[in-house]
Amino acid sequence: MTAARLGALDPTVFELAARRVMARCDELARITSTPGAITRVHLSPEHARVNRLAAEWMREAGLQTRQDAAGNQLGLLPAADPEAPVLMLGSHLDTVVDAGRYDGIVGVLMAIEVVRLLQRRDDDTSGVDAPARSPFDFGLEVAAFSDEEGARFGKALLGSSAVAGTWDDAWWELEDPDGTTLREAALEFGLDPGRVSEAARRPSELVGYLEAHIEQGPELHARGEPLAVVSSIASARRFQLVVEGEARHAGGTPYDMRRDALLGASEAALAVERICSTQHHIIGTVGQFEAFPGAMNIVPGEARFSLDLRGEFDGERDRVWDQISRELDDIMGRRRLRWHTREVHNAPALFCAPLLQDVVGEGIRSTLVPGSAVDGSILGSGRPEDPTTLFSPAGHDGMAIGAITDVGMLFMRNPDGVSHHPDEAVSLGDVALGIRALAEAVAHLGAEHRRT
Amino acid sequence: MTAARLGALDPTVFELAARRVMARCDELARITSTPGAITRVHLSPEHARVNRLAAEWMREAGLQTRQDAAGNQLGLLPAADPEAPVLMLGSHLDTVVDAGRYDGIVGVLMAIEVVRLLQRRDDDTSGVDAPARSPFDFGLEVAAFSDEEGARFGKALLGSSAVAGTWDDAWWELEDPDGTTLREAALEFGLDPGRVSEAARRPSELVGYLEAHIEQGPELHARGEPLAVVSSIASARRFQLVVEGEARHAGGTPYDMRRDALLGASEAALAVERICSTQHHIIGTVGQFEAFPGAMNIVPGEARFSLDLRGEFDGERDRVWDQISRELDDIMGRRRLRWHTREVHNAPALFCAPLLQDVVGEGIRSTLVPGSAVDGSILGSGRPEDPTTLFSPAGHDGMAIGAITDVGMLFMRNPDGVSHHPDEAVSLGDVALGIRALAEAVAHLGAEHRRT
C-alpha cells in the first residue's frame, strides 16, 4: 500500500476508526482502582484487565498478540519476510492517579486502527482466511506499554525501559505507597522478575518507533491547528527531597527557637516556581508534599516533597537544578534546617529522528490538504505546507525506546490543554485526522524504506 | 494536715515520690501504638491499658477508682463528709504522635503522690484497715483525662470537655485518619455514647482544679528557676484549611496556566509565620500539610493544611486571624485559587483563679525557702519571696474544666524547653520540688477553705 492509495480511501473510514477509538477510551476508563475516577497503575489487577482487552482488540484487528516479560501488551503484524524488522507503534495504558482517559491510551488504540487500515491479506489468491500481513518491507507492531507514568513506584517508563534493555535490577526494590516492592508486585501479577531481560529488543529488530499522543498543553489549540510534528521530548529529572528540623510543641516554642521543616519546604517550593518561571522551556513542579509528625499542635520536624524538573536541553535543566540547590542551601541554612535529596529519575532530552519527523510531517500534509480532511470545520485552518513542530515538555515512552531505535511523534490538539486530569479531552475529528496522518506517515516511511 | 505539718515531713519523702513518678513515666512510655516511639491516642487499646495501670496506682495510694463515661480515669479520696465537694488534681494520659513522656502524664502521677502524702487514716482509733480520707473539708480527686491533645480526632480536650459538661454531640461524627468516627471508637472502647453526659460534673461538686505540668518552653530554664505559678492559659483556635486549584499535567502546563494549590498553601504557611512572629504572645503553627492528588508529575489541584493559633488574649488572637484571612484572600486571589476553612477548636483564654494562683504561689514559697529544698543544687536560685508567674501558650485541660470551676496551675522547669517530642525532659529534683509545692498548695487551700 502506498501513501497515494491510502489517500484514495473513503474518508469516512478514518471517522469510523476514530469513533471506535473514542468508544474504547471510554471503555478502558471504566477499568480503574478508584470508582468514579480513573487510576490504573503498573502491575495492578486493572493493568491485567486492560491488557486482556487490548489483546482482544489487537487480535480482532489481525495482530498476533503476546504479553512480554515486563507486562507490556504487544500485537504483531509481520512482514512477508518473518525475519524483517518491525516498526513499533504505540503508547501506554497505565495512568496517573485520578487521570484523564486519553493520555497514552488513545495512542495505543490509534495504532491498532492504523495497523488495521494498512494491513494486507493475500486474499486475491489464497482465500479470505490468509493471515494479515504488513504491506511494507518491515512488520508493524503495536506496543501497549505497562508503565509510563510511574504513578505506583515513583520510577517512570518501567515498561518501555524493559523493552529498551535499560532495566536496572535495583528497581525491583522500589516500593509503592503500601510498601509493596516492584518485585513482589511483579510476582503477584504473574511475571518472573528473573526473566525481565527477555522483554528487551535489539536495535536490529526495529525500524523505529512512532507514537500519537494528545498534546498536554494548549499550544495547538491556541494556534487553531489539529496536529503537530514533535521535535523532541523534554529532558526530565525527578527528586525526592527531605528537610529536617526539629519537632517542637506548637504553643511553647517561640519563633526564634523553631526549626520548622514545613516552612523551609514551603519556601523551597516557592523558590522552584520563582527560578523556573523566569527560564525558557524549563518547568519545575512540586507535586508531593507532606509534613511530619503531622499533628496540628506540633512544629513539623520533617517535611518531604518531590521535584519534577524538565527542560528542552539537558545542560540548561542541570544548570537550573544547580541554581535550585544553591537556593535550598540558603533557605535551609537561614532556618537552621538540613536538607538532602535522592534522584529517582533522570532522562536526557530525546530528539526525534529527522526521517521520522519528515514522515510525520508528510502524514500531516497529506491529511490536511483541502478536500481530504474528515472534519470539514478544520479544513483550511491547518497550514499543510508547513506542519507545526512542537517540543514536548511532557515525557513519553519514546524517551526510553530512543535508546535502541529512532523515535517519531505526532501530537493532537487538546482543547483546554488539560492533561493528567479527568477533564483531559481530544475531539473525535482530531483523532480521525490523527489516525489518517499516522497511517500516511507509516506509508511514507514504507516508501522511503523501500527506496533505501 | 496543715501546711506547717507538711513542712515537718522528712524532705526525702518528696524525692522518693518523685522517683516513683519518674519510673512510672518510663513505664507508661512503653505503652504506645508505635514501637520505638510514644503515641497514645484517645480510645485506643493503649488508652485502655494506661487507664488500668493508673487505676491500679490510684488504688495502691488509697483512692476509690472509676472510669467515667468519657474514658477519663478517676480516683477519689473522699472527705469525712461524703457530700463535700472535691478539689480535682490531675492532667491527661494521652499523647501527641511521637511524643515525650512527661506532658500531661507527670501531672497525673504527681497528683497521685500528693494525695498519698496528704491523706489521713483514722487509724488512731479504729485500726489500720480504716479507709484513707481527705484531711480537708473537701475531698481530693485525681483525674487522668482521656484526651487533651486531640491527636486522633483533631478536636482537643475531649475528656475534660465531657467532665465540664460542654460536650457537643456533633463531635461523635469526627473521624480519625483511618475514617473511624469518634462514635465508633467509643463503642469499640466499651463506652456508651448515649451516656457521655454522665461524665459531666456540676460546679457545686468541685472546689477547684489544680494541675502540675512541665513548662513547654524555655522560660524557667532561662531564668534558672524550678517552678512557676501559671497566670493564664492561651486562647486557642484551630482550623483545617483547604486550597483548591486545578490538577494539571506537570510537563504540559505553562506557569501562567497553572492554578497550583500547593504553592498557594506554601505562601499561606509562610504568611502565618510572618504575621504572627511580629506580634507579642501570638503563635501560629502549620503542623499538617498535604497536596493532592500527590503525584510527582501533576500540578496539585488541592492542598490541605492546619493552623493552630494561640494568644494570651482572645481579642488579639481574633484580630490576627482576621489579618491572616485577608492575607489568604490576597494570595489565593492572585493565584486564581479558592480557599475555605473549618474551625475545629475554639477555646477562650483561661485566667487562673486569683485564690488558686495565691495558693500555688504559697506552695512554691514554702518549698523553696532555703534549707527545705530537696535538690541542694537548686537552693537559693529560686526567689521564694516572689514566685515567677508565667503565661502558658500551650493548652491544658484547665481550659475545659474552667467552664465549671476555678483553675490553678504549677509549671516545672523544662531543661531545653522541648515538648511534644521524644527529647522532652524534666529533672527528678524539679519533680520532687513540684510534688512538694503542689502538696503545700493544696494544704494552703485547705486552710483557706476552713477559714471561709
Task: Please identify what each model-predicted range represents.
Chain A
Residues E15-A18, A29-R30, T181-S231, A269-R274, ...:
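Active-site-adjacent substrate-binding region
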Residues T2-S44, W171, E343:
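N-terminal capping segment at the start of a domain
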Residues S33-P78:
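A non-catalytic alpha/beta surface segment that caps or lines the substrate-entry region
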Residues S231-I233, H249, T253-T278, R326, ...:
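His/Asp/Glu-rich mid-to-C-terminal helical/loop segments that flank catalytic regions of hydrolases
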Residues V21-R24, A29, L87-S91, G376, ...:
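Zn-dependent metallopeptidase/amidohydrolase metal-coordination segment
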Residues T39-L43, T285-G294, S306-F313, R338-D358:
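A short beta-alpha structural unit
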Residues P135, D147-E148, R152-D314:
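Midchain, well-structured core segments that form catalytic/ion-binding scaffolds
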Residues L89, D98-E148, R237-V243, H249-I275, ...:
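Alpha-helical metal-binding/catalytic segments enriched in His/Glu/Asp
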